[in-house]
Design a protein with these regions (language model features):
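Long, hydrophobic N-terminal alpha-helical segment
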Residues: 1-39
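Short, structured motif recognition centered on aromatic/hydrophobic residues
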Residues: 6-13, 23, 46, 53-58, ...
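A cross-kingdom feature marking solvent-exposed beta-strand/loop segments within repeated
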Residues: 6, 38, 61-70, 74-76, ...
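Beta-hairpin (beta-strand-turn-beta-strand) motif
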Residues: 60, 78-85, 104, 131
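Short loop segments at secondary-structure junctions
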Residues: 16, 49-51, 61-62, 83, ...
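Short N-terminal helix-initiation segments at or just after the protein's N-terminus
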Residues: 15-28, 59-65, 89, 124-128
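Vicinal oxygen chelate
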Residues: 1-2, 6-14, 35, 44-49, 55, 66-91, ...
């Protein structure tokens, strides 16, 4: 796997009000917001002064994410930025490690993503993020 860095921490929340409360407490601002059809969720990427790693709030509208942590939400995943999500998928699958998707899917705000199944990541859901252009999150 080529260059990696922590891109963001994903937090599932049951509603927008909870995300706004969190942002108010910690002085986060919305950097980019977009609905991700593949996961039926409104995704809000944040920024904060001197913050190198983004926080992504995931507000599901339907599907399995609505039941995450019994519907209360919580820290969901850690995301690693890579140069080529598809190359990462192939590399790990050659080692017998499976991803959630057969191919990368569109994420919010100019990225494509895929997730390594938690059983291969020491119980942690790891997302791989590829930025599609310079102004992607």
């Amino acid at each position: 796997m080529d260059r990696t860095r922590i891109h963001h921490i994903g937090i599932v929340l049951p509603n927008r009000e909870r995300a706004e409360q969190f942002m108010d407490i910690f002085n986060f601002q919305v950097d980019c917001e977009e609905y991700v059809e593949a996961y039926h969720a409104q995704c809000i990427f944040t920024k904060c002064k001197d913050q190198e790693v983004a926080v992504e709030f995931i507000i599901p509208t339907e599907g399995v994410l609505t039941q995450y942590n019994n519907g209360k939400g919580g820290i969901h995943h850690i995301a690693l930025q890579v140069d080529d999500v598809e190359a990462v998928r192939k590399e790990y699958e050659e080692k017998g490690l499976k991803m959630l998707e057969e191919a990368a899917v569109p994420g919010a705000c100019g990225i494509i993503v895929n997730f390594m199944r938690p059983k291969y990541g020491a119980g942690i859901l790891v997302e791989f993020v590829e930025r599609l252009h310079e102004d992607s999150v």
